[in-house]
């Protein structure tokens, strides 16, 4: 039976950790629950006294699902259908079992090999605007190149997006589960950044970026390997999600291995 999780807090994901931490897909869904202020609803499925599945509905019509082998998959599919018009993220091995049609795939990759780290990163807790600008560098460039988009509209868009990103990131830093690390040159120049969330002994690297000019010089590998290596020291398991083959192969060269695939799709009525 599925029941709503009442009184969500930053402790909710931690309380469910032991049930869903065996596989990267379970952790991926738990990290979707970690930023609980952006969650529109969360439900647990249990059979007798055994917790079998977790459903998390987030902003922008996204649903994250993880389930154990003894879950009631028919109930899961029927329930998600009733949520209506959602893009579903679920482990590839349960896609058909909940009646979902997949249209895309992401790979969950874990650090398995020792990463050589010629560049050391530093942790950043304040003045995060340069971090955000680097993470969104390519998107802002696309906007500014569009002749139909005025510069003031780009600034308005990026300022609003920054405030939303800052709210989530600073909240995570304040609550002790988010770390922002950077490769710096000199005092102010940031060459590469990464943002990761931490839940017990697991670390989810959710955002990585390297300055465009610096990347063209061929230093992205050195920077990102340093960032990932430093995050690995914060937990027993460090993983990230890739949504294309080129990125997946890039991280394989850094010492990551693909452990599991998540399907993105919909349940057609």
Predicted regions and their residues:
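Short amphipathic alpha-helix that is part of the acyltransferase structural core
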Residues: 1-28, 111-163
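Conserved donor-binding loop and adjoining core beta-sheet/short helix segment
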Residues: 21-81, 192-206
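Acyl-donor-binding surface of acyltransferase catalytic domains
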Residues: 52, 57-123, 265-267
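A structural microfeature
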Residues: 52-53, 189-192, 220, 260
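A conserved beta-strand-loop-helix scaffold within acyl/acetyltransferase catalytic domains
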Residues: 57-58, 145-209
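Conserved acetyl-CoA-binding loop-helix of GNAT-fold acetyltransferases
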Residues: 71-79, 210, 216-230, 253
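Conserved GNAT acetyl-CoA-binding A-motif
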Residues: 82-92, 231-243
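Conserved active-site alpha-helix within GNAT-family acetyltransferase domains
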Residues: 93-103, 221, 244-261, 268
């Amino acid at each position: 039976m599925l029941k709503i999780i009442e009184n969500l807090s930053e402790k909710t994901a931690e309380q469910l950790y032991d049930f869903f931490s065996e596989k990267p897909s379970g952790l991926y869904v738990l990290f979707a629950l970690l930023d609980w202020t952006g969650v529109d609803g969360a439900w647990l499925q249990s059979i007798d006294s055994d917790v079998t599945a977790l459903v998390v509905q987030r902003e922008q019509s996204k649903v994250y699902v993880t389930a154990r082998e003894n879950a009631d998959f028919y109930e899961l599919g029927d329930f998600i259908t009733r949520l209506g018009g959602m893009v579903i993220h679920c482990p590839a091995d349960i896609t058909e079992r909940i009646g979902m049609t997949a249209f895309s795939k992401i790979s969950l990759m874990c650090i398995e090999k020792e990463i050589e780290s010629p560049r050391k990163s530093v942790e950043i807790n304040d003045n995060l605007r340069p971090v955000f600008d680097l993470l969104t560098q390519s998107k802002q460039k696309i906007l500014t190149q569009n002749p139909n988009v005025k510069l003031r509209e780009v600034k308005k868009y990026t300022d609003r997006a920054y405030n939303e990103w800052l709210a989530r990131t600073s909240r995570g830093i304040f609550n002790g589960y988010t770390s922002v690390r950077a490769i710096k040159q000199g005092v102010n120049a940031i060459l590469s950044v990464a943002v990761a969330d931490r839940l017990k002994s697991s670390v989810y690297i959710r955002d990585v970026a390297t300055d465009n000019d610096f990347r063209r010089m061929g230093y992205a590998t050195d920077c990102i390997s340093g960032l990932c290596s430093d995050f690995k020291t914060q937990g027993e398991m460090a993983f990230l999600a890739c949504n294309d083959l080129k990125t997946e192969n890039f991280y394989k060269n850094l010492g990551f291995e693909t452990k599991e695939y998540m399907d993105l799709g919909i349940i057609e009525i």
